[in-house]
């Protein structure tokens, strides 16, 4: 029984998604339906959490919009998510960056991870 479920879930999972981690700045292209037409909307921010559960995987992106913090959780394999692009890699030592919610300005910055030689 579980093999059937696993096979169905693997069939629905997206392939070709980039590797990203908490602290990375990503641009998520989201399909937005307005009336009868569909368009793409970009949501750029810092990944503050990732939940790895196979088909039910999700990640949370935080950005500052007009001085107000905005967080949005995306299902990784959702048909609403069109593409994910990693803009920069962040060097962090935590899996969940919820402490960024209380910070603003320079204290909310994340150092950039330098490429290994």
Curated annotation (Swiss-Prot):
GO terms for biological process: translation. Keywords: Ribonucleoprotein, Ribosomal protein. GO terms for cellular component: cytosolic large ribosomal subunit. The keyword tRNA processing does not apply. Pfam families: Ribosomal_L19. Signal peptide: none annotated. InterPro entries: Ribosomal_bL19 (IPR001857), Ribosomal_bL19_CS (IPR018257), Ribosomal_bL19_sf (IPR038657), Translation_prot_SH3-like_sf (IPR008991). It comes from the Bacteria. GO terms for molecular function: structural constituent of ribosome. Belongs to the bacterial ribosomal protein bL19 family. HAMAP family: Ribosomal_bL19 (MF_00402). This protein is located at the 30S-50S ribosomal subunit interface and may play a role in the structure and function of the aminoacyl-tRNA binding site. PANTHER family: LARGE RIBOSOMAL SUBUNIT PROTEIN BL19M, RIBOSOMAL PROTEIN L19. NCBIfam families: rplS_bact. This is Large ribosomal subunit protein bL19. It comes from Vibrio parahaemolyticus serotype O3:K6 (strain RIMD 2210633).
